[in-house]
Structures are given as C-alpha cells and as structure tokens.
Amino acid sequence: YNLETSQHAGKGHSPIRTQGQRFLTDFSCDGTVCFSYSAGNIRMDKHLALLRESNTVAISYTITNQGEEAGLSITPLMNFREHSASSAVSDLQFTCEPNTVGGFTLIPAAAPGLCIELSCSAGRLFPRENQYDVDMQYQTEVDNETAGLDTHFCPYDLRFTLPAHSSTEISLLCTVHPVQDTPVLSRPQADTAAIEIAHVQEYYDSLKQQAGYGDDAFANTLVVA
C-alpha cells in the first residue's frame, strides 16, 4: 500500500493523485495536523506540528498492525526555499550524510552556513535511487489557477518492522540551525514527538478558550469588527 497523500501535475488540468487518497479516513487541522489511514490490516495516524519558539517540526506516527508481520517505509521529503516560492531539482543541491541521531543531515549549497537535521526514534536508513520528487502540486495553486509546482529532495527511506498484532509509535524531529551547532537534536524516544505535539495542542486550546472561540458573542463581535 502507498499511503502518500499528494498530487502531481498531469496532462492538461487533471492532477495525478497518489494512492494514499484512497486510504485516508480522516483529516484534521486545528493548530496541529493529523492524517488517519486504514489499509488492509494497518491503521495509522500521522500527527505533526511546528514546535513553539523553535524552528523544529515534530511528526508522530502511531501504527496498529492487526495482521501478520509487515514492513513500513517512510520517505522524508526535504526542501530549502523561501516561503511561498517553488523549487526545481537545480535549486535543491545538498551535502548529505547519515547522522548519529537516527536520521540524516543536509547542508544546502544555497546556504552553506545552515544545517537541516532529521532525527528518528527507530528504523534503518536506505539510500534511494530516485532522489527527487518532482512537480508536486498544491491544491491552493490549483484553486487559484496558478502553476505552483514544487520539487523535493528525498535521499533516504526510513524502514521499520511492524510485528504481528502490535501497536508501534515512531517519532521524527526535523530542525534547521547554524552548521557550527551540529548536532542540536538527540535521538528521540518513541513518544517524544507525541508529547511535544500535545504541548502545542494545549497551547492552541488555551488560546481558543481565552478568546471565547465557539461562543456566539465572540462570533458576533468578529462580524461587527
């Protein structure tokens, strides 16, 4: 099963959607983002958030395998560009090597003083033959009829074993920092990302509570304003 949920430019006005769209059972975006999938005997939640006061994203995977032993492959898509800009293969040139915290480290040719560091709680790295995901298309551009195609660098797959009739939790952290500070991440525990994401969700929930989010009086005030 391919649980990638994205779309790429096709011929004419018809985008090519990946197989993951078929297995997506739920999606939420409420301060943090969560994708839920069901495929065969596998159930998976992918939960992610930008950490507060830190140039770091946390991704938590919770996978339930209700069948025989299975394998899982995660392909991190990496990019380095200005916000709202697009990128091509020629823009994504990196020095890339495995690191000591379960992931890999990238130094962009466009900014050699910076380092992109990925850490993972488990799994093994496997180099990919095809290292670029080309012409990814975002729905915002489709809706606005603009040609915002993007490309990502994907040098490695992370592979995991899912024991039969088991539940597995995986944490990924990715951050950007000056090269001289390398490394800044430690290898996370299986639940590290979930804990960090919960802190972010608590923060957004507190903002809503303070603002009276969901209160008719608050909504009326916004309308008047």
Regions found by a protein language model. Name each.
Residues 1, 38, 62-64:
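A generic structural motif
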Residues 1-33, 114-128, 180, 199-206:
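An extended acidic
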Residues 6-52, 131, 135-149:
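Extended, loop-rich substrate-binding clefts of extracytoplasmic carbohydrate-active enzymes
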Residues 41-43, 52-58, 67-69:
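Coil-to-beta-strand transition motifs
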Residues 48, 62-63, 174:
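Hydrophobic beta-strand positions in extracellular immunoglobulin-like domains
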Residues 56, 66-225:
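Acidic/polar, glycine-enriched structural segments that form the non-catalytic walls/loops
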